[in-house]
Amino acid sequence: MNIDDTTIERCMMKLLSERSAGSSICPSDVARALASDETVWRALMPAVRKVAARLAEAGVVRITRGETTLSPDEIDHGPIRLRRGPGFVAD
């Protein structure tokens, strides 16, 4: 299964649109929405984080750990959450 960055981004935006403005999602929510097989969704996690980093740089999403907003270069390890950024536009 080949899942590209555009597909990951669309899924991420859809999941964030379905939540209230102050809510967050886990990157694994995105991966699991794209692939139900654990081996496959786990393999998608680096790509999901890469897309999240790109969208964070553009201000579309915020990457957080607890209540702290992280810069994209701080997400190579550890738990993170994704929230709507100031440039987020709901569908």
Give the label of every model feature segment.
Residues 2-5, 89-91:
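Long, charged, low-complexity intrinsically disordered regions
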Residues 59-65:
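A short, conserved structural fragment
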Residues 54-58:
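Basic amphipathic alpha-helical segments that dock to polyanions
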Residues 3-24:
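Positively charged, polyanion-binding regions of nucleic-acid-associated proteins
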Residues 66-91:
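Short, cationic-aromatic polyanion-contact patches
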Residues 35-50:
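Short, positively charged loop/turn segments that connect secondary-structure elements
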Residues 23-34:
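Short acidic, hydrophobic short linear motifs in intrinsically disordered regions
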Residues 12, 27, 86, 90:
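Metal-cofactor-dependent catalytic cores
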